[in-house]
Amino acid sequence: MHIGQRIREIMTQKQHSVVSVARALDCERTNVYNIFDRKDINTSLLQKLCVILDHDFFKELSKDTFKK
């Protein structure tokens, strides 16, 4: 799974703007766009995004890791 692309998909589905996520993360919009390009992400940032977007990315990553 490309985590950055998945974050973008969930943001779109839940109608969160880049601006609103940047504000919630206390960062610039460019940082959010940079997240979209990432194939991996640190856990503290992912945890914040889980809360902001009300989505469990950890569960998705776990399923992706252990699928047969």
Provide a role label for each language-model segment.
Residues V18, R29-T30, F57:
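The DNA-contacting recognition helix of HTH DNA-binding domains
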Residues E9, K14-Q15, N34, L61-K68:
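Short, charged recognition helix plus adjacent turn
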Residues S44-E60:
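DNA major-groove recognition helix of helix-turn-helix/homeodomain DNA-binding modules
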Residues D26-I41:
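Recognition helix of helix-turn-helix/homeodomain-like DNA-binding domains
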Residues Q15, D40-T43:
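Residue at a beta-strand N-cap/secondary-structure junction
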Residues M1-H16, S20:
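A short, Lys/Arg-rich alpha-helix, primarily the initiator
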Residues T12, R23, V51:
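Alpha-helical residues within the helix-turn-helix
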